[in-house]
């Protein structure tokens, strides 16, 4: 539990459901976990979640630059790319598995960047992890910029 250094790492705020400031987080939240990628994904899945590696193409901390490939058999529903690359280019350049959906998010680190890149899903039924996973598996999604 190292203390955060706001002067070099930036502030870490805790907000409530309405987005209102609650407090500053004093502990540094940038430290890595002592899990392998496979262990992490397995735990997320076991808890009913859905692991989607984020901005896999980004030079800093992206899955492809860090590992050089997507591990075969990694039980994820999708791979997320940054707004800097087209899905078709990412698929070809990084030899992404055909069975995995490639989605895009805004990778927002600032409030005004939220929604700058969007993947729309065609869901059947209620909003749930299972229905999102099914839509991704059945390729019922579209990347919007």
Q: Model-derived features: where do they sit?
A:
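Charged catalytic cores and adjacent phosphate/nucleic-acid-binding surfaces used
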Residues: 1-4, 11-12, 17, 28-29, ...
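Internal active-site segments that recognize and position negatively charged phosphoryl groups
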Residues: 34-44
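Divalent metal-binding segments
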Residues: 21-33
């Amino acid at each position: 539990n190292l203390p955060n250094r706001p002067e070099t790492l930036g502030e870490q705020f805790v907000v409530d459901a309405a987005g209102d400031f609650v407090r500053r987080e004093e502990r540094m939240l940038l430290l890595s976990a002592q899990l392998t990628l496979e262990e992490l994904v397995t735990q997320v899945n076991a808890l009913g979640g859905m692991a989607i590696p984020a901005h896999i193409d980004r030079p800093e901390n992206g899955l492809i630059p860090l590992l050089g490939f997507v591990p075969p058999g990694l039980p994820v529903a999708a791979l997320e790319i940054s707004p800097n690359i087209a899905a078709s280019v990412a698929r070809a350049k990084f030899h992404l598995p055909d069975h995995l959906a490639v989605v895009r998010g805004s990778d927002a680190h600032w409030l005004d960047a939220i929604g700058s890149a969007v993947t729309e899903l065609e869901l059947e039924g209620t909003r749930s992890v299972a229905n999102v996973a099914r839509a991704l598996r059945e390729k019922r999604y579209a990347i919007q910029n």
